[in-house]
Amino acid sequence: MDLYPILKQMVNEAADPLYTAVKLAILGNSLDLMVADTAAAFENSIKDRLDAPLALEIFSAFEQQLRASKRLVYFGDNAGEIVFDKLLIETIKELYSPEIVFVVRSVPTLNDATLTEARFIGMDSIVRVIENGIDGPLPGTMLRRCSNEVNDLVRRSDLIISKGGGNFDTLDEQIEHLQKKISFLLLSKCEPYYRHFGVEIHQLILANYFKFLPNNAQN
């Protein structure tokens, strides 16, 4: 199923393309929860879920940080949802023209995105795509196990975008090392996320950890 044209049209027709692209990127984290046999059924499922709430003040802080950022690192998660990530990255580039590096797993765990999937959807045609350098399967990102290249990019970045629960579970423990310049995009899939973020199960989570922007915490 070719999802991209459907998603692209949703963004193009939106009153706020970035807001819609962010929501779609988070909804991509719920592909494993969706049941759709046809493109029309998938489109209807996505449109229904686009009504899910996403706090405007949190989104506004994210947008403000994007405006001030020249270098971004985007940690991808699962293979299927990187089509959604590509759409968000394209939207960010069109609006703010930052330098973006998309990081995939060197070794997949189950359905993790790798260079193969990123190249298949053409991610490498719009941004630089690199592996995280972790030797062995790990459903997340531990910076001490990542390559020197990834760590150097993280240090020099103005903003890190972390996609999915696996990346949140690992990177959240490294906030101080990340200098509080990270935004987590994920779906509230379980009780621990509900307790941590105060976001109902199956709802959208955008959590910002910024050093210099006020009023930007999710919880």
Predicted regions: what they are:
Residues 71-73, 158-159:
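Structural motif
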Residues 70-71, 97-102, 181:
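Residues at the starts of beta-strands that form the adenosine-phosphate
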Residues 79-97, 101:
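Histidine-anchored nucleotide/phosphate-binding helix
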Residues 61-65, 75, 88-89, 149, ...:
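Short, hydrophobic/aromatic alpha-helical segments in well-folded domains
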